[in-house]
Curated annotation (Swiss-Prot):
Name used for this protein in its record: Probable phosphoribosylformylglycinamidine synthase, chloroplastic/mitochondrial
Observed phenotype of the null mutant: Lethal to the male gametophyte.
InterPro entries named among the record's database cross-references: Class_I_gatase-like (IPR029062), FGAR-AT_N (IPR040707), FGAR-AT_PurM_N-like (IPR055181), PurL_large (IPR010073), PurL_linker (IPR041609), PurM-like_C_dom (IPR010918), PurM-like_C_sf (IPR036676), PurM-like_N_sf (IPR036921)
UniProt feature coiled coil, ranges: none
Native organism taxonomy: Eukaryota, Viridiplantae, Streptophyta, Embryophyta, Tracheophyta
PANTHER family in the record: PHOSPHORIBOSYLFORMYLGLYCINAMIDINE SYNTHASE (PTHR10099:SF1)
Protein species of origin: Arabidopsis thaliana (Mouse-ear cress)
GO biological process per UniProt: 'de novo' IMP biosynthetic process; microgametogenesis; pollen development
């Protein structure tokens, strides 16, 4: 599956044209541009690069390159970049698909010049070599770099420079990554090379080259504009010439002393400005006094940087814990005390609260599938474990404003590490996300409420770019890591208020939360003891993310733009996953877990995480023990940079060997950087400098850091913040006479906070892990609408956890207190649709995003906290954690633009039965469905802060509120009682857009019609329909009406019948008997989907978007049918002492192994966890297995094409290759490849197999980029055809849904003869089909564009099957997001896909 190389034109339009670039044009009209470096322009070595005069050969290279040797974990050369002796180049065409190329050309002609008549692309691989490659190894490198069926499209000379067109002017533009840091792409590419024995490769970066032909010579500014269009200025640059060196000529800066003893505070003020330390008045006073009067010496620049990061607002939350003075009156409680008061009043089931990296509540005793010998090759079996439910939430706002894609990547990655670094380590399960940005100003969109006069800051990305790139970054990171994203929210806002203030999210919100699990025995971190080892595990150090903690604590625009860039981190999801696998192996050891304590590296880098892990005992740390990927880094940079994918852990000395063994298996670096010494200090030494001094007969240099922990990390003096409340001017909502309901809906349904979120959900994996019981999409058409997200704890139990989000920031512009209460109310009215253990078990994360230190905002935040506390205590629920981001403002057009203050409530709770979840899609027809309205506002209909007000350029003056808190409690308990007895068929909360939007959305999702008949009770039409007062709409059966009403009355809850459901797809809205709307469901749904589809066109192929948009008008419930009845595996199989062994094989970046193991386990197999590392090391051989499975995921992060690196690691390691060849030939074995494994089997030639003529690379079928050019995740329909496949026996003739999630799933047949032979032999057993069950190539039914709907290929003997969809993620019915009510199945039971795995078991029995 590939997302990083999803070759959509829009992905090359994410640069910025707001900043002029210094570009140089040579006399030959080739534009390479300037390589901008961290400090000064890079001086490139201009010696001529070595030319390799070789051409791509169609023959396969020989396999005998690597003999399977393996290095130790502490060496891991792929992680440590060595200087390259030379840089060689290979070029490959094309860079992007033909359709994407045409789209890019069209955009260029529109934005740059219509004189441009053609555009051609290629990619350049810039390869750093430690020494020359021999011919045999060179052929291997070429195989890795080339497309297997197009070897002629790879060469050592540029293809673009050969092209000429008579009478046209040509210019070449090349863009690529900045050289100041190694990209994650290069890290994975080098890792692939190492796995194939190409140890000479030290770095491999990819650049993109564009050839423009124009009728007239392009002007300099036009070339600059094009360059800006096709690269990200924050992470990339334009190359002025062919790279001949990766050296940056950066000289590491020596440790400096800051003359505080001589110059006092002035010295700190100067370094504060120079380094962007974000010291405020109180900081400057405290640290001047600390060093002059207490420590009595000059601090080093490393110490000051250290203090700035670990004691920044971002890290220490001074504001939340500080003293507040409002309107001249000291407040008796801090914000932290106010929020914690809810937890102190209602702890109940809390096991971790207001400490650690996450919070947790008491879970259940469950049977978890886990390895018997974690950290080594072994079988998996179920064991009873006491698992608690865990939750964490945080934001990554500042980085996303500066560089949205990497900022969001690392936001997601940092939160993932917060999850797994809780207690002594914990399990990552699923994520939620949220985005708040300014006005999109999307070209061609209908958004008359957006103010076209607003100016946007040049140092920040535009709101539109942030929404697209940040969501791409977070999605791609989660997809590669293997964490499903199952819930979220989106909001845009930009308006000048009646007070004259402009409020807008120029500094955006990128919200990321995670729900996971933790073994109850691991909830408490161990305390450091003398002799314990301080260990860092994860990726190497790079010069990135310098000062992120301090920079994120400032209003955007206060800091230097280059410092802002330096503060943005870079993510490597594949490295993050390897890190998590090491942590998971440790925690699955149970009571033998070697991890005593764990903290993830985030804001402040080592500055923060190391001091956290050694506090209060202290340790001496050797900076040179840290694994670095850039040897030019200074002590300051190694200590302070926020390079990601790192944890600090404490282990006992005797655990060192087992930890090294686990790290070696997962190919992760491990470094012991110090030992707990009990001195209470953090002392940072430089052993290299000390050795040099010793050699020269000099005393060792003083430590770069030597600080008493208590004085910089312990109880430091509180800060005091003073505010006055501000009464902002308000104006009543004024809707012009003559505005109709349809006029209003045309606007409201297009507002991003209301409209479809399809553009966010189809690009993110929502099924990986197999533990997702409820994600965003619902109903027969899989519309993005779910209110609550639900996870399962295991594959064998029905217990789980649910989470839901509430946030109402626009209401806060009118009344911060009401906003807080509404956020709580929305979270609960979303959460209520999952059956939970009890309302009193609900806990929540509270995330505060305010410009808190600006006038009026601190007091508003304080008032909101008081209201939040009071409401939660009355409800019996509590906040148990959260984060704050308190510099939510940016400079623009001469003013400070504050973001609307936002409080995001993420409620989470335990579920006794995950199958009892109600979705919003209407299900009842034939006059049986009745709609009930449960009104929490008891008749009030206030429009202030509503979507209606926003789309008419106003906010109004009368704010909705939760006036009766106890009534919300009654409603929650009452609806829970209805769900327990299966009396509710559909339900949805009332939120953005009001009652009418809630009802419409339910109809959209169910593909039904509705008749709404409402009474105005003396208020206006718009108040009746669009007020966003809290409430619920329930669909119930007419036969259950009396029972429902009676049960609600038992909870003192009243409900009103407001309409009925119809099978006819027509929506009719009456108020006081007058019809105000009568329109087709599809027509209104098209309005609701319009904004999402426009955003989709900026992310995937426009023709695919149009096809889906038009097709949606005619969609109907899929016509699925089964040719068999699913059943659980026979107990005789499950109880056998000896079961057939199946090797579940994974490579670096694979992420589908556990759900695959669970599926085979459920079919009576003994699944084994086997890595390629195990096979290379000889720890296991394949001769003991009857089945092998190649799992899904992103092996090597899909670098160099999907599964290419995995295939290379097998093909070019002789001992491993021979094992696979022998296994393939054995007549009593079978193999299965899913997704990435499917792509691998094609590359290995296992399907359709040599007998069909597909063994040569040039004719072997491959799975290539989806036609849409993007990763796609959908629950799609497939039909099962007759075939020899042993795993699909007895399933022929069935049509059903299955999860599919990939970026490269389009079957491609270079040789038509192979395709014909394959079809004639019935070797394409699985086909994508439409709603009628017909095989199709139409998008999105066929999500990748495979010819003839081909979704799977098998071998002629049926033993080997490769398929792109994921049956292992839906082998249980609760994993299905929807299925026909006509199916005779139990939601708690097996799904039809289990039969696939049972068939394999039956076949083995018959052999």
């Amino acid at each position: 599956m590939n997302t990083s190389q999803a070759t959509r034109a829009a992905l090359f339009l994410n640069g910025s044209n707001r900043q002029a670039m210094l570009l140089q044009r040579s006399s030959m009209s080739q534009l390479w541009g300037s390589v901008r470096m961290r400090t000064s322009r890079l001086s490139l070595n201009r010696t001529k690069a070595v030319s390799l005069r070789c051409s791509a050969q169609p023959n396969k290279p020989k396999a005998a390159v690597s003999t399977g040797s393996f290095v130790t974990a502490d060496e891991l050369p792929s992680l440590v970049e060595k200087p390259a002796a030379e840089v060689i180049h290979f070029y490959r065409v094309p860079l992007i698909q033909e359709s994407a190329n045409a789209e890019l050309l069209k955009a260029v002609q529109t934005k740059i010049s219509n004189q441009i008549v053609s555009l051609t692309t290629e990619q350049s691989f810039n390869i750093g070599l430690e020494s020359k490659l021999k011919d045999e190894k060179l052929s291997v490198l070429k195989w890795i770099l080339q497309e297997t069926y197009e070897p002629e499209n790879l060469g050592t000379d540029s293809f673009l420079e050969r092209k000429k067109q008579e009478g046209l002017h040509a210019v070449i533009v090349e863009v690529g990554p900045r050289l100041s840091f190694t990209t994650a792409w290069s890290t994975n590419a080098v890792s692939i090379c190492r796995a194939c024995g190409l140890d000479e490769v030290t770095r491999l970066e990819r650049s993109r080259r564009y050839l423009l032909f124009s009728k007239e010579p392009l002007l300099e500014n036009q070339i600059k504009e094009f360059a800006a269009m096709v690269h990200d200025r924050m992470t990339e640059c334009v190359y002025t010439q062919k790279l001949v060196s990766f050296e940056t000529n950066v000289v590491p800066e020596e440790v400096k002393y800051v003359p505080v003893m001589e110059k006092g505070r002035k010295a700190l003020e100067e370094i504060n400005q120079e380094m962007g330390l974000a010291f405020d008045e109180q900081d400057l006073q405290y640290y001047t006094r600390l060093f002059r009067e207490d420590i009595k010496r000059d601090p080093t620049n490393v110490e000051l940087f250290d203090i700035a990061q670990s004691n920044s607002e971002h890290s220490r939350h001074w504001f939340f814990a500080g003293n507040m003075v409002i309107d001249g009156k000291p407040m008796d409680k801090s914000l932290m005390q106010i929020v914690k008061s809810t937890w102190e009043a209602n702890r109940n089931n809390s096991v971790i609260g207001f400490k650690d990296n996450s919070s947790a509540i008491r879970g259940f005793l469950v049977n978890q599938l886990r390895p018997l010998l974690p950290g080594s090759v072994c079988l998996l079996d179920v064991s009873a474990r006491d698992l608690d439910i865990l939750f964490t939430a945080e934001t990554h706002n500042f980085p996303c404003a500066v560089a949205p894609y990497p900022g969001a990547e690392t936001g997601a990655g940092g939160r993932i590490r917060d999850t797994h670094a809780t207690g002594r380590g914990s399990f990552v399960v699923a994520s939620t996300s949220g985005y708040c940005v300014g006005n999109l100003n999307m070209e061609g969109s209908y958004a008359p409420w957006e103010d076209s006069s607003f100016q946007y800051p040049s140092n920040l990305a535009s709101p539109l770019q942030i929404l697209i790139d940040a969501s791409n970054g977070a999605s791609d990171y989660g997809n590669k890591f293997g964490e499903p994203m199952i819930q979220g929210y989106t909001r845009t806002f930009g308006m000048r208020l009646p007070s004259g203030d402009r409020r807008e999210w120029l500094k955006p919100i990128m919200f990321s939360a995670g729900i996971g699990q933790i073994d109850h025995t691991h909830i408490t971190k161990g305390e450091p003891e003398v002799g314990m080892l301080v260990v860092k595990i994860g990726g190497p150090a790079y010069r990135i993310g310098m000062g992120g903690g301090a920079a994120s604590s400032m209003v955007s625009g206060q800091n230097d733009a280059e410092l802002d860039f330096n503060a943005v981190q870079r993510g490597d999801a594949e490295m993050s996953q390897k890190l998590y696998r090491v942590v998971r192996a440790c925690i699955e050891m149970g009571e033998k877990n070697p991890i005593i304590s764990i903290h993830d590296q985030g804001a402040g880098g080592n500055c923060n995480v190391v001091k956290e892990i050694i506090y209060p005992q202290g340790a001496e740390i050797d900076i040179r023990a840290v694994v670095v990927g850039d040897h030019t880094m200074s002590v300051l940079e190694i200590w302070g940079a926020e390079y990601q994918e790192q944890d600090a852990i404490l282990v006992k000395a005797e655990s060192r060997e087992i930890l090294q063994s686990i790290c070696k298996r997962e190919r992760l670096s491990m470094a012991v950087i110090g030992t707990i010494n009990g001195g209470g200090r953090c002392t940072l030494i430089d052993s290299t400098a000390a050795a040099k001094c010793s050699k020269e007969g000099l005393p060792p240099p003083p430590p770069a850091v030597d600080l008493e922990l208590e004085k910089v990390l312990g109880d430091m003096p509180k800060k005091t913040f003073k505010f006055n409340r501000i009464a902002y001017a308000r104006e009543p909502l004024d809707i012009a006479p003559g505005i109709t309901l349809m006029d209003a809906l045309k606007r409201v349904l297009r507002l991003p906070s209301v409209s479809s979120k399809r553009f966010l959900t189809t690009k993110v994996d929502r099924c990986v892990t197999g533990l997702v019981a409820q994600q965003q999409t619902v109903g027969p058409l899989q519309i993005t609408l779910a209110d609550v997200a639900v996870i399962a704890q295991t594959f064998t139990d029905l217990t789980g956890g649910a989470c839901a989000i509430g946030e109402q920031p626009i209401k806060g512009l009118l009344d911060p207190k009401a906003m807080a209460r509404l956020a709580v109310g929305e979270a609960l009215t979303n959460l209520v649709w999952a059956k939970v253990t009890a309302l009193s078990d609900v806990k929540a994360s509270g995330n505060w995003m305010y410009a808190a230190k600006l006038e009026g905002e601190g007091s508003a935040m304080y008032d909101a906290a008081i209201a939040l506390s009071e409401a939660m205590i009355e409800l019996g629920i509590a906040i148990d954690g959260g984060k704050d981001s308190l510099s939510m403002a940016a400079h623009a057009d001469g003013e400070v633009v504050k973001a609307p203050g936002n409080l995001v409530i993420s409620a989470y709770v335990t579920c006794p039965d995950i199958t009892k979840t109600v979705t919003p899609d209407l299900k009842l027809g034939g006059d049986d469905g009745i709609l009930l309205h449960v009104d929490l506002a008891k008749g009030k209909r206030r429009l202030g802060g509503s979507a209606l007000a926003q789309v008419f350029g106003q906010i109004g003056n009368d704010c909705p509120d939760l006036d009766d808190v106890p009534y919300l409690k009654n409603v929650f308990d009452g609806v829970q009682a209805l769900i327990a007895e299966n009396l509710v068929s559909a339900g949805h909360d009332i939120s953005d857009g009001g009652l009418v939007v809630t009802a419409l959305e339910m109809a959209f999702a169910g593909n039904k019609g509705i008749n709404l008949d409402l009474a105005s009770n003396g208020i206006s039409l718009f108040e009746t329909l669009f007020s966003e007062e809290l409430g619920l709409v329930l669909e119930i059966s007419k036969t259950n009406l009396d029972a429902v009403m009676e049960k609600l009355r038992a909870f003192d809850v009243t409900a009103e019948i407001i309409g009925n459901v119809t099978d006819s797809p027509l929506i009719e809205v009456k108020v006081d008997g007058i019809t105000h709307l009568s329109e087709k469901t599809s027509f209104l749904r098209d309005m609701w989907e319009d904004t999402s589809f426009q955003l989709e066109k900026l992310q995937r192929l426009a023709s695919c978007v149009e096809m889906e948009k038009e097709g949606l008008k005619f969609r109907h419930e899929p016509n699925w049918k089964l040719s068999f009845i699913p059943s659980s595996t026979n107990n005789n199989y499950m109880s056998q002492d000896v079961k057939p062994k199946v090797a579940v094989i994974r490579e670096e970046g694979s992420n589908g192994d556990r759900e695959m193991s669970a599926a085979f386990y459920a079919a009576g197999f003994e699944p084994w966890d086997v890595t390629v590392s195990d096979l290379l090391a000889g720890d296991i051989t394949l001769d003991q297995f009857r089945g092998i499975v190649f799992v899904g995921g992103f092996s090597y992060a899909d670098v160099l094409d999907s599964a290419k690196g995995w295939a290379a690691s097998i093909r070019f390691n002789e001992p491993v290759l021979s094992q696979f060849q022998e296994f393939y030939k054995r007549p009593d074995t079978f193999s299965l490849g899913i997704c990435n494994g499917c792509q691998l089997m094609a590359l290995l030639g296992w399907v359709p197999g040599p007998q069909v003529g597909g063994s040569l690379d040039t004719s072997q079928p491959r799975f290539v980029h989806n036609e849409s050019g993007r990763f796609e995740c959908r629950f799609t329909s497939v039909t099962i055809k007759d075939s020899p496949s042993i795993m699909l026996k007895g399933m022929e003739g069935s049509t059903l849904g299955v999860w599919a999630a990939h970026g490269e799933g389009r079957a491609y047949f270079p040789d038509e003869g192979v395709l014909d032979h394959m079809l004639h032999s019935d070797l394409a057993p699985l086909r994508y089909c439409d709603d009628d069950g017909n095989v199709t190539e139409a998008y999105p039914f066929n999500l990748n564009g495979s010819p003839l709907g081909i979704a799977a290929i098998c071998s002629p003997d049926g033993r080997h099957l490769a398929m792109m969809p994921h049956p292992e993620r839906c082998f249980l019915m609760w994993q299905f997001p929807w299925y026909p009510t006509s199916w005779d199945v139990e939601k708690a039971g097996p799904s039809p896909w289990l039969k696939m795995f049972q068939n394999a078991r039956d076949w083995l029995e018959s052999c």
